[in-house]
Regions:
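Non-catalytic terminal/accessory segments
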Residues: 1-611
Length: 611
């Protein structure tokens, strides 16, 4: 398929899907090289790019020739995905999570499939779904709860047991076939699902679920659970009643008395100065009262928010109604989605008690939020009826973080140095410390009183950094602090790069600007031509048809990968120095140079230019 035709086809898929028509021609789109280049451009920089699966096939050595081989294999039916190599990685709770590592070719195929699925389903997904989606994140999920869940009385937690391991393959393919007509494309997804895995070099078949670590797994899980989103949206439409709460009778009584007095003033029956004290007294009595009736049975709402397989439901209503909602959701998950419920982790909690979601504690409190509004020619103040929902940093989270990073004793506020950094440069040490605390602070930026809560950890972090540098310099903490002091009161270190002086500042909580999600930007329609087919610098380099080592223009050309520039030490081979100078993890090489480099026999480029 021609490049322009492929791009136009990709741009139109979303609109066709939204119109309700089934999509065909996806397998033909996979025959376009431009889609494979885009797939490679999206994943080549990932840490796992050169991590091996069940064989030595990685993304290293990517080339047009390799793309054409894969396209031909798909076209003639000889492509068969390899089993993934299963490894186990530690979870936050100390347990292990299985991870499937595909081969390099399978990663490319999966990314192409993922791109096509995203074009079909992204316009169809619910606005309440936030996991593994463009321009959505844990922060957009939490911000949605923070901005729309006020007044929530009950929070329903339903935990799906082993979701990624137990997705029903037949049901998933049936769901896909509702939107996709291309049988060859569906069969390809089926073969990816059933490729199996090797654990300690013993093959295990996969008859359900998607491999965690697979590139397609996140979007396939969203397609599966989109059915749950649709169910909950329909349930909310049935449950939600009342445009607004009825007025609180007592609040209404005092409001009426104030209004009568003001009308008397307007009619000239009473003097404004003489009645002001009486009005102020009535307003003082009215102020603590909610303007609406929090127990109004005619006002009900159901909210929900999902991130991957983790979701919460907020209910404005009675506990009995929350229990009925929970029962309906459990039934749908077990019967329609054919998944199991973890009963011990599923519960209903009063919103004032709080619950955990995406690393935050979500809870309500009875606030004194005053709303200013206009009534006729006057401005009045009303107390909000809603209990204000807040996001909090969970108790013990900061101490746990402190312990894991070995900053010192959190309770006693006693810092210590970190021996693992003593062999690193001071720039590397400060950069590592900055990344740790800035990452934590940015994640909890939505929490109420985030700066105040983090301040204790910040002091411990700073002293730990000073002690680490003091141990490296073999001097005192005070001398380190003095040497790092900047004119504006902050701390930093001066260093040179290519003769130019630079300053690396220490993270400063006082001047830290808490980034907040702008939910309105989520509805902006992207430029699909730019979004889908961005020609990355890497692809431009590959299309230049020139070896970046020997400078030959005789192909074919391949992309050489390294794990990271830190693994390359200056002063060794010329090809390594080239990569450092260009600050790149990739190098475009002709096939001969790449083979010689891999074998450790790459001579100086002058010798190669004579060939």
């Amino acid at each position: 398929m021609l490049t322009d035709t492929a791009i136009r086809r990709l741009e139109s898929i979303g609109q066709v899907a939204k119109s309700g028509k089934r999509i065909n021609g996806l397998f033909r789109l996979m025959e376009s090289e431009i889609v494979w280049l885009e797939a490679y451009a999206r994943i080549y920089a990932n840490k796992g790019a050169i991590t091996q699966g069940v064989n030595q096939n990685t993304l290293d050595g990517f080339s047009y020739e390799r793309v054409r081989t894969l396209i031909n294999q798909l076209r003639d039916g000889t492509y068969h995905p390899k089993p993934t190599r299963r490894v186990f990685i530690p979870k936050a709770n100390g347990k292990l999570r299985p991870l499937g590592l595909p081969t390099g070719d399978d990663k490319l195929v999966q990314e192409v499939v993922r791109i096509l699925l995203e074009k079909i389903y992204e316009p169809l997904f619910s606005k309440y779904s936030h996991g593994f989606r463009p321009r959505r994140s844990t922060h957009t999920a939490l911000d949605q709860i923070d901005s729309t869940w006020n007044g929530t009385k009950w929070i329903v937690n339903v935990d799906i047991q082993g979701f990624f391991d137990n997705m029903n393959h037949k049901l998933l393919l049936d769901l896909l076939s509702k939107k996709i007509e291309d049988k060859r494309f569906l069969n390809l997804i089926g073969s990816l699902l059933q490729a199996g895995y090797l654990e300690e070099w013993k093959f295990h078949g996969t008859y359900s679920g998607t491999p965690q670590g697979g590139i397609c797994s996140p979007i396939l899980s969203n397609i599966y659970l989109n059915e749950l989103d649709i169910f909950l949206e329909n349930l909310a439409k049935e449950f939600n009643t009342g445009a607004r709460r009825r007025a609180n009778p007592l609040y209404k009584h005092y409001t009426h008395r104030i209004r009568v007095i003001r009308k008397q003033v307007d009619a000239g029956m009473r003097d404004q100065k003489t009645v002001q004290e009486e009005i102020s007294a009535l307003e003082k009595v009215r102020r603590p009262l909610p303007s609406g009736d929090p127990l109004d049975p005619s006002f009900k709402r159901l909210h929900f928010c999902r991130y991957a397989d983790d979701f919460v439901i907020g209910v404005i209503g009675s506990k009995r109604e929350a229990e009925a909602i929970m029962g309906a959701v459990k039934t749908f998950i077990s019967t329609t989605l054919k998944l199991n419920i973890a009963e011990e982790k599923s519960h209903i909690v009063h919103a004032s008690k709080g619950t955990s979601f995406l690393g935050y504690t979500i809870k309500t409190y009875t606030g004194r939020k005053i709303i200013k509004t206009r009534r006729g020619s006057r401005h009045i103040r009303m107390k909000s009826v809603s209990k204000q929902l807040q996001l909090h940093i969970p108790a013990g989270r900061l101490e746990k973080f402190c312990t894991s990073k070995k900053y010192g004793n959190y309770q006693k506020l006693k810092a210590r140095h970190r021996t693992q950094f003593l062999n690193q440069s001071e720039v590397e040490i400060i950069s590592a410390y900055n990344a740790e605390l800035r990452g934590l602070a940015n994640y909890y930026a939505l929490a109420t009183g985030a700066k105040a809560r983090i301040s204790k950890l910040y002091r411990l972090w700073q002293v730990s950094l000073f002690k680490t540098l003091a141990a490296k310099r073999k001097t005192t903490v005070n001398k380190v602090a003095t040497s790092l002091r900047l004119d504006d009161g902050g701390y930093g270190i001066h260093y040179q790069v290519k003769g130019q002086m630079r300053t690396l500042r220490l993270f400063r909580l006082k001047t830290w600007e808490q980034p907040r999600v702008d939910s309105s930007e989520l509805d902006v329609e992207p430029n699909l031509a730019l979004f889908i087919m961005t020609k990355s610098e890497l692809i431009q380099r590959l299309n230049a048809n020139k070896c970046e080592y020997c400078e030959t223009e005789t192909g074919p050309f391949e992309v050489h990968h390294v794990r990271g520039l830190k693994s390359i030490r200056p002063g060794k081979e010329l090809w390594q120095r080239i990569m450092i100078a260009r600050n790149r993890k990739t190098l475009i090489l002709c096939k001969r140079c790449h083979q010689l480099l891999t074998a450790g026999k790459l001579p100086p480029p002058e010798a190669l230019r004579c060939r």
